[in-house]
Amino acid sequence: RRWISDNNRWNSPRYILGESYGGIRGPLLVSELRSGDLTPIEINGLLMVAPASDYQYLVFHPGNNSPHYGFLPSYAATAYYHNKVDTNKSLQEFYNDSKDFSLNEYGPALLKGSRIKDNDKKILIDKYSKFTGLSKRFVEDFDMRIDPSSFRKELLRDEGYSVGRLD
């Protein structure tokens, strides 16, 4: 408020840019500026760049299965890029198949928890392995719940590399 007054910028347009976690903070900031205890500051727009709009899909805590099925298609695309999957499909087809598996088979299975039948679990582990390029043993050891850091370390382990966070 002080800078706006000192520089006579009350009639200038004002925009807020929220990137990543700013996807949650940006709207809160706009709300606070518009309805603050002091003179309200109108905002002309809010720009969101790759917003993280729901922490539930980003935080890998025990009992929260959402990020696991949400990240699987990204794992699949990364494995495809590094030639760790056996497929003749295009990246787009493979990615779409991984999304379908994640939403219609893998995600619902995670919700069953320990009630999933052994045979069904083996089938899911096999499919998860085929989509991600990770060994069945690794997938089973992690109970089909692999966080990004573990995925990055394991995918290229046999070559002596790890995948970068932005790959």
Predicted stretch roles:
Residues 30, 34-133:
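A catalytic-pocket lid/entrance helix-loop region that shapes and gates access to the active site
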Residues 109-167:
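Alpha/beta-hydrolase fold catalytic core
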Residues 8-21:
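Alpha/beta-hydrolase fold nucleophile elbow
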Residues 1-5:
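Alpha/beta-hydrolase active-site loop
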Residues 18-31:
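Glycine-rich nucleophile elbow surrounding the catalytic serine of serine-hydrolase chemistry
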Residues 24-25, 57, 71, 153:
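Short alpha-helical interface elements
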